[in-house]
Amino acid sequence: EIKMRNFEASIPVGFFCYPISQAADITAFKATEVPVGEDQMPMIEQCKEIVHKFNTVYGETLTDPKIVLPSNKACLRLPGIDGKAKMSKSLGNCIYLSDEEADVKKTQ
């Protein structure tokens, strides 16, 4: 991934902190199952590693999340509301939990 993103001389700290941030998002809500697309499995595996190491040091504190993949292979990547690419905050084609019902319906 470092080569793919062309991080030659320096690697942004956000790149290294992202797995910790995602693990915090999952563990803060004590998620037992995490529905993800196949492309997100490495991130969830890292989360599971973080949980295991944390629990080894501090006792059984965090919940170890189970990866739940879609049963339909056609849904391995959730399409964005633009219908072009996978749903992503950075592409601006996602639905937020804070979106109003009318806005969500507008995207259907």
Task: Set out the residue ranges of the language-model regions.
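Active-site cores that bind ATP or allylic diphosphates and position pyrophosphate for catalysis
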Residues: 2-108
